[in-house]
């Protein structure tokens, strides 16, 4: 599903570039915004890409980008754990995220009438994650289970072995999901250090595709971030 949505968004942007109907703007905070209005259906996708992934990790914190991605959905100072999920689900939203070697991205697809609410929650999640220790330990178990599952998947093992042969010294050698040894022991402070280093608006690209007014969408992003 994550791969399908990523391809879908990129196809939309490619189509926008071809048609010349998209708008790209750099905000005063350094954030890049891309807006492509499509009025065919009353729906909109907000997708923020952070220019960081496992390539920006070290051998000591490998897997932190993916682990942090899981933790962004665990509440903020304004919205306790579960509150955002409740609000967005009540409005028919689809929310997800993905981490790769080069980037991490988070998206919301929602009826366009709730665009302002979605953008406010989206920015709050990306800028003010709370990462409660209790939730961190829950997600630690989830990620460790994912690592164990990957270790028992033949196709994944083939990919990892090929990756090891191709990248012996390059940062691409690191697995996006990390290792059980590191994920099992990494501290909350280390995760927050990574967040503080890379999750600034100047390191983000926010795409808005769907039933929106370009100027209003850009103004809302600037207000929210």
Locations of the language-model features?
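Boundary at the C-terminal end of the N-terminal hydrophobic targeting segment
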Residues: 17-21
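Sec-dependent N-terminal signal peptides
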Residues: 4-14
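Charge-rich, well-structured scaffold segments of protease-associated domains
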Residues: 26, 84-225
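M16/MPP (pitrilysin/insulinase) zinc-metallopeptidase core fold and M16-derived inactive scaffolds
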Residues: 40, 45-109, 175-177
């Amino acid at each position: 599903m994550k791969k399908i949505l990523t391809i879908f968004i990129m196809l939309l942007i490619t189509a926008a570039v071809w048609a010349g109907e998209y708008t790209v703007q750099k905000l005063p905070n350094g954030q890049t915004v891309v807006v492509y209005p499509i009025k065919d259906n009353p729906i909109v996708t907000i997708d923020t890409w952070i220019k960081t992934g496992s390539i920006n990790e070290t051998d000591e914190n490998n897997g932190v980008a993916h682990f942090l991605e899981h933790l962004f959905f665990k509440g903020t100072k304004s919205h306790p754990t579960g509150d955002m999920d409740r609000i967005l689900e009540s409005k028919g939203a689809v929310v997800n995220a993905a981490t790769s070697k080069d980037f991490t991205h988070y998206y919301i697809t929602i009826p366009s009438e709730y665009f302002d609410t979605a953008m406010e929650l989206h920015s709050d999640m990306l800028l003010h994650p709370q990462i409660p220790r209790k939730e961190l330990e829950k997600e630690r178990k989830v990620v460790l289970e994912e690592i164990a599952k990957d270790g028992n998947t033949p196709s994944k093992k083939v990919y990892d072995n090929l990756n090891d042969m191709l990248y012996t010294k390059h940062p691409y050698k690191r697995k996006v999901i990390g290792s059980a040894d590191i994920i099992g022991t990494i501290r909350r402070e280390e995760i927050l250090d990574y967040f503080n280093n890379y999750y600034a608006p100047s390191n983000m690209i926010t795409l808005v595709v769907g039933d929106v007014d370009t100027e209003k969408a850009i103004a809302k992003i600037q207000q929210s971030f």
